[in-house]
């Protein structure tokens, strides 16, 4: 078993991960990084530019797997810092609650949320960040948009896998869907 799981990081071997993806839904987190004003109103939405699971270059949310033995809060912080840099300073509550749950399937007709690799259940959060955000890891760019720009058809056309729908749900949740 030790050759299948790195117990220090809870990562599965590539072969075991492929087997799990083929047979078991995985738990993910999606995070919409936002900047807020002094009253807490969302003024900007951060979107990454990266290679999506379908191979396209797309605007995307912060997203990633929750590791075995990892708290959801810790997974959120890990993925936010991995994609936005260690100085992003995300404001994640002690016990975060998702604004929605998105189920990603290889088949686009099931839920409208698509990941060609597997079935994933993703807890979605809006997370204010107050620090210096710089794209890292696989992200090619990070751009900040007003809520109206983020909800536009132009941005939706640059997104894939149904993440534009998740972004609009997030904007509605914070009262910023135009």
Explain the meaning of each model-derived region.
Residues 1-39, 114-115:
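Acidic, metal-coordinating catalytic segment for phosphate/diphosphate chemistry
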């Amino acid at each position: 078993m030790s050759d299948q799981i790195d117990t220090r990081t809870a990562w599965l071997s590539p072969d075991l991960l492929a087997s799990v993806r083929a047979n078991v839904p995985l738990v993910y987190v999606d995070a919409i990084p936002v900047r807020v004003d002094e009253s807490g109103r969302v003024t900007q939405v951060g979107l990454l530019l990266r290679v999506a699971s379908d191979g396209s270059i797309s605007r995307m949310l912060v997203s990633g797997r929750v590791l075995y033995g990892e708290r959801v809060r810790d997974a959120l912080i890990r993925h936010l810092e991995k994609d936005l840099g260690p100085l992003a300073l995300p404001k994640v509550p002690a016990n975060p609650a998702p604004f929605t749950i998105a189920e990603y399937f290889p088949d686009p007709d099931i839920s409208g949320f698509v990941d060609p690799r597997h079935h994933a259940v993703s807890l979605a959060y809006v997370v204010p960040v107050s620090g210096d955000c710089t794209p890292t890891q696989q992200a090619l760019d990070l751009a900040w948009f007003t809520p109206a720009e983020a909800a536009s058809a132009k941005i939706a056309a640059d997104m894939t896998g149904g993440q534009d729908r998740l972004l609009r749900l997030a904007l509605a949740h914070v009262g910023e869907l135009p």
